[in-house]
Structure formats: C-alpha cells, structure tokens
Amino acid sequence: MVSVAEIRKAQRAEGPATVLAIGTATPANCVYQADYPDYYFRITNSEHMTELKEKFKRMCEKSMINKRYMHLTEEILKENPNVCAYMAPSLDARQDMVVVEVPKLGKEAAAKAIKEWGQPKSKITHLVFCTTSGVDMPGADYQLTKLLGLKPSVKRLMMYQQGCFAGGTVLRLAKDLAENNAGSRVLVVCSEITAVTFRGPSDTHLDSLVGQALFGDGAAAVIIGADPDTKIELPLFELVSAAQTILPDSEGAIDGHLREVGLTFHLLKDVPGLISKNIEKSLVEAFTPIGISDWNSLFWIAHPGGPAILDQVELKLGLKEEKLRATRHVLSEYGNMSSACVLFILDEMRKKSIEEGKGSTGEGLEWGVLFGFGPGLTVETVVLHSVSAPAAH
C-alpha cells in the first residue's frame, strides 16, 4: 500500500513553473486614435456635444495610444443603436456578441501559442480562461476547449469579471497548478472584447469617457509547465513567486457593474496616485528575499492602465525611461486590453530582447517584475526570472 505522503510527493513537480510559449491575437478592425473622436461622436449621434467632444479629443491626445483593435465595427454599431446610446438597455445584444467572440479570439491566440510550443495539444492538462467580457454557462473555457479540440478531461478554471489586474492572477494560478502537478501543461488564455463597455458619451459620467479613450480588444495565451523537457520545449521565463494585495484606502477607486445597459465603468479616485504610493511596498516584499533593492536592475512588465499610472510609477521609483519601454509600446499599439496587456508585453519583451541580441529574454537582465493593477484596488505582483536568449530561439 502506498502512503498519502508518497502519492503527494510523486504528484509534485520539481522545478519552478516556466513560460513555454506565448501567442496573441486581435480583431481585424483597427482604429486609429487620431481619427477616433470624430468617429466616436458621429457613430453615437453626439456631434452636437461640441464641448464634450473637445474634452474627449484631449483625452485621446494624452492617452499615448496610437491605435487600438475593436470587434465593434461601424456596421455592427449601426445595427445595434442601443449599444451606441449612453445608457440604453442593451445587455442581450452585447452578450450575444461577446459570448461567441471571446472564445473565438481566445482560440486564435491559443493556436499561436500551441504552434510555438510545438507539442501536441493532447498534452495540455489544464486550462485557465479569463475575461471581463460577458458571462455564460457553460463558460468561455468550455467553448474554447471545444473550439481547440482539447481533450474532454482537461481541467478547467474560468475567471469572469476580474478586470485589469487579472493578467497577473492567471500567471499566479497557473504557477500553482503547474508546480503542484508533475507533467502538467497549463494553457492560460485572456480574451477581452470592449463590446460590453462601449457606450455613447455623457457629460455626467466623464470616467466612462476615459474608458472609451483607453480600452481596446485583444487576446493572449501562454503555455506554462514546470520541469520543461529542453529537448523539445524552449523555456522563456520562470515564474519565481506571485502575490496579490488590496491597496489601503482604495475602496471604490475602480468599479465595474454589469447592468441592463452593459458593463458600466467608474473611476472614482486618484488611481495613479494610489498605485504609485503603494507599489514600492509590493516590490520590497517580493524582492527582499532575493536580495534586490535596485528597481532599475529589473526588467519591467506593468499593466498600462493609462499613461498617468506609468508616469507616476516611473517618477516615484526613479525608473529609467527605458524600463517601461515594452509596456508603453503595447499601450501605444493596442490600448488598454485589460487582463491581456501584460501577456502582450511579455511577448513583446522576449521578441525585442532576442532581436536586439540582449543575452536574456528579459532585456539582458536576470530578474524582472510583472504587475497587474485593477478593481479593488488590487495589485498582482509576479517575480520573473529570464532565460538566456540563445535558449529562446
């Protein structure tokens, strides 16, 4: 008879969870930020609101976003006038879109990650799916399992409605799954479509307008496993530790509520100030055990909630300009894609690091940090260890 302790020991993996592949996808419809205010006020029949339009123009100019991708095309919006209104009952129309499109976009990203990984999809043992767009039963995790043709015994975890910090959350959960189950391979997918939050402008709800200037659609997928077989798998980053915390005095700073009118977005406090004031505490807790206190010695992946958050974090921590280069690049090219952003940045960083011959997947540095920020205010902190770049080819 085998003891429980022996079974438990055999179940555990040896090494740390490792990122083995990354894939990303966006809808085909690309929206340029310079053209967006005119388009947005026209499509929502709000051109008479000239002062508000000027305000929105300034928001778009300050956003540091060049372009975004959106499932919602002009044709779709013309067919769904209630989605264009500021507050009209429209949840059914929105749900009908996202329940189908979220798993589809997730499948595109996942297929790219699986292709890069190079292993049969039958080796995927766990699926973690995350979206803030739409809720359904069975969920987007089930739909993706069907779309990809994963085995029916894949162990699924569905995270709905978490918000912008959740790119960190999925890595934390995948790390625990991979390290606790020897031989497991976890497919992680974040798929976000703004059809749930899109709405017309109102001068009574400027924080909603901020969201209209920032949010974009995108999906990202990563494959995570401990003890990679380096003959057939190429490690990209190791996940060394992960933490989650609620910031003090931040209740109500970011809220989202699912209503008949869709998902409403509220920004109630000085979010950049709250994050920048508290971020060093998370860094100290994460890196003191490793013996690191120079934040410029790390490579950085931070959720780009908006440019003000990045500016204030940079200022508060005395970060060199190049530290947030990958983060700012993704914000500029895609906008704020909620949970998917940090995975896009991870992808951008390893690609650029290899292109530029940096010597490691983390811009030539050994240690890095990944931050998710979102409703709560919740902060996710993931400590990353890079892999020497030749191994990542």
Swiss-Prot record:
Pathway field: Secondary metabolite biosynthesis; flavonoid biosynthesis
Catalyzed reactions per annotation: (E)-4-coumaroyl-CoA + 3 malonyl-CoA + 3 H(+) = 2',4,4',6'-tetrahydroxychalcone + 3 CO2 + 4 CoA
SUPFAM superfamilies: Thiolase-like
Spans traversing the lipid bilayer: none
A GO molecular-function annotation: naringenin-chalcone synthase activity
Catalytic residues as annotated in Swiss-Prot or TrEMBL: 164
CDD domains (UniProt xref): CHS_like
Alphabetical UniProt keywords: Acyltransferase, Flavonoid biosynthesis, Transferase
One BP term from GO: flavonoid biosynthetic process
Induction remark: By light.
EC number of the protein: 2.3.1.74
Enzyme class: transferase
Pfam families for this protein: Chal_sti_synt_C, Chal_sti_synt_N
Superkingdom of this protein's organism: Eukaryota
Signal peptide region: none
Keyword Acyltransferase listed: yes
Function noted in UniProt: The primary product of this enzyme is 4,2',4',6'-tetrahydroxychalcone (also termed naringenin-chalcone or chalcone) which can under specific conditions spontaneously isomerize into naringenin.
Family under the similarity heading: Belongs to the thiolase-like superfamily. Chalcone/stilbene synthases family.
Protein name: Chalcone synthase
Organism: Vitis vinifera (Grape)
Gene expressing this chain: CHS
